[in-house]
């Protein structure tokens, strides 16, 4: 469930993107994404296609814990979570090969259906990092360099021979919410 802050961030995201035209809108089936997407989809008068494979990685025994709790309970530096997942060090977590394959399948679907068009994907930080890893042909563990805030925007332009990050981790709620902004 989103917190009150999360609902406010979702409304600011909707305000920022209001009036934009997207040829395709996809979203994860998970509750927090559905709640984040609602104000935006309502403002656009649109529905999103739900792609089950866009759900967040299964963190196994880490699921439901805050980062500081993971450090205390499991004795690992949660800042290195991508490395731990990629190495298979997290009990009961989704295997990295399966996660990569799942996200690759959803990416291929979205690229096929939205080739040359504006596509909006509403998903999770781990999914965004895996999409970046696949598009940039980099190991997932290196994606810890990319911060992904809640309700933030990452804009990627993909052409047949090149992927370019146009905007990353832009948080409209920082500009429209507490800070006043436009």
Regions found by a protein language model. Give the residues of each.
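Glycine-rich phosphate-binding loop signature in dinucleotide/nucleotide-binding domains
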Residues: 18-21, 110-118
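A glycine-rich beta-strand to alpha-helix segment
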Residues: 114-128
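Short beta-strand scaffold positions
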Residues: 27-28, 101, 122-123
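Short glycine/proline- and acidic residue-enriched helix-loop micro-motifs
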Residues: 76-98
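Acidic, low-complexity terminal tails and accessory targeting/binding regions
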Residues: 57-69, 112-117, 133-182
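Phosphate-coordination/substrate-recognition cap region in phosphate-metabolizing enzymes
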Residues: 11-79
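Short catalytic helix/loop segments, enriched in acidic residues and glycine
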Residues: 1-12
